[in-house]
Amino acid sequence: PYAEPGQQSSYTATLGGKTYGISIHRQADQSLPVVTDELGKKFYDNRVDVVITCDNAEFFKKSYTKEAFAGFLTASAEAEGTVLLGMAFDSEKSDGHAIRLGAQIGQVGVGEGPAFTIEIPLDGGVSSIVRDNNQDTTGNDMTD
């Protein structure tokens, strides 16, 4: 199977008067089920590790796989033959209440698929995942 190259991103954000460091590391994970696309090509799925520090102390740490988003994948085409493509800090949607990360599920090399927002409350509350229909790039967007 093909493994996408690892990807490391780091961001700094000042929110609510505090400084947050956000580290996002994507890597192929051979312990996850192998994904086969519609052409029969096999891929290792990705794991994304997120670590957030606040004033240099660890604030949030979690690993994500496609399984975390499975309940939001509405069509079998969204779930089969796709991997967790990656995540990024969303500075426009983050504010004094929450850090928000964008995530995308899709086919390797295509860069299209359902998009999600991961919300991490700054008060230490439970993180949540929401499907982001505005950023969705599945190609079924309706236009007026």
Question: Where do the PLM segments sit?
Answer:
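Short hydrophobic/aromatic-rich beta-strand segments that constitute the beta-sheet cores
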Residues: 60-61, 101, 127-130
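A short, polar/proline- and glycine-enriched secondary-structure boundary/capping micro-motif
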Residues: 34, 71-73, 111-113, 138-144
